[in-house]
From Swiss-Prot:
<dbReference type="GO" id="GO:0005524">
    <property type="term" value="F:ATP binding"/>
</dbReference>
<dbReference type="GO" id="GO:0045892">
    <property type="term" value="P:negative regulation of DNA-templated transcription"/>
</dbReference>
<dbReference type="GO" id="GO:0006419">
    <property type="term" value="P:alanyl-tRNA aminoacylation"/>
</dbReference>
<keyword id="KW-0820">tRNA-binding</keyword>
<dbReference type="Pfam" id="PF01411">
    <property type="entry name" value="tRNA-synt_2c"/>
</dbReference>
<keyword id="KW-0694">RNA-binding</keyword>
<protein>
    <recommendedName>
        <fullName>Alanine--tRNA ligase</fullName>
        <ecNumber>6.1.1.7</ecNumber>
    </recommendedName>
</protein>
<keyword id="KW-0436">Ligase</keyword>
<dbReference type="InterPro" id="IPR018165">
    <property type="entry name" value="Ala-tRNA-synth_IIc_core"/>
</dbReference>
<keyword id="KW-0648">Protein biosynthesis</keyword>
<dbReference type="GO" id="GO:0000049">
    <property type="term" value="F:tRNA binding"/>
</dbReference>
<keyword id="KW-0030">Aminoacyl-tRNA synthetase</keyword>
<dbReference type="InterPro" id="IPR050058">
    <property type="entry name" value="Ala-tRNA_ligase"/>
</dbReference>
<dbReference type="GO" id="GO:0005829">
    <property type="term" value="C:cytosol"/>
</dbReference>
<dbReference type="GO" id="GO:0002161">
    <property type="term" value="F:aminoacyl-tRNA deacylase activity"/>
</dbReference>
<comment type="function">
    <text>Catalyzes the attachment of alanine to tRNA(Ala) in a two-step reaction: alanine is first activated by ATP to form Ala-AMP and then transferred to the acceptor end of tRNA(Ala). Also edits incorrectly charged Ser-tRNA(Ala) and Gly-tRNA(Ala) via its editing domain.</text>
</comment>
<dbReference type="InterPro" id="IPR045864">
    <property type="entry name" value="aa-tRNA-synth_II/BPL/LPL"/>
</dbReference>
């Protein structure tokens, strides 16, 4: 991959081939959402779908959402310039299922994307799961062949997603790549986690 355009097109094309509707990025200033100054995540344009207030013509979607994070729950502003991975503006690539598939299919799609679509070396990958989510840990072993040392259990909000104080929520899983010993930092959940060695994507 030679750059961001290749990454974006590989991601969107992969999910389109797997039955997802490509949905354009919504505006940076959300329409009809007084809770946000800026769109800060890919799911923002689907809030009403997740809560059952709106129905779309598709049950799976993929996006490359333009996002700004300068305050609130997802404030990256304080980390800009201190890490190699924090910016205020970025594109969030996402895939969404609205009652179509669940955890097993999501993990399988993610694994095939990173190992076949992006051709990342399997031996350098590891995942995090919410500490109480045995199902996800079992699925990562089954689908990716991971041993326990490649599955890091996190008990904090880092692996429990919630839309807000109320509403949709649940455990999540993240994939990390080890960038090598020449990059400072420790694996997720360690005291050295804030380094850039283990990059989440």
């Amino acid at each position: 991959m030679s750059g961001v355009n290749d990454i974006r097109s590989t991601f969107l094309d992969y999910f389109k081939k797997n039955g997802h509707e490509i949905v354009p990025s919504s505006p940076l200033v959300p329409r009809n959402d007084p809770t946000l100054m800026f769109t800060n995540a890919g799911m923002v344009q689907f809030k009403n779908v997740f809560t059952g207030l709106e129905k779309r013509s598709y049950s799976t979607a993929t996006t490359s959402q333009k996002c700004v994070r300068v305050g609130g729950k997802h404030n990256d502003l304080d980390n800009v310039g201190y890490t190699a991975r924090h910016l205020t503006f970025f594109e969030m690539l996402g895939n969404f299922s609205f009652g179509d598939y669940f955890k097993e299919n999501a993990i399988e799609l993610a694994w095939k994307l990173v190992t076949e679509g992006f051709d990342l070396p399997k031996h350098r990958l590891l995942v995090t799961v919410y500490s109480e989510d045995e199902e996800a840990a079992t699925l990562w072993k089954k689908i990716a062949g991971f041993s326990d040392d490649k599955i890091i259990r996190i008990s904090t909000s880092d692996n429990f997603w919630q839309m807000g104080d109320t509403g949709p929520c649940g455990p999540c899983s993240e994939i990390f790549i080890d960038q090598g010993e020449n990059v400072w930092g420790g694996p997720p959940g360690s005291p050295e986690e804030d380094g850039d060695r283990f990059l989440e994507f």
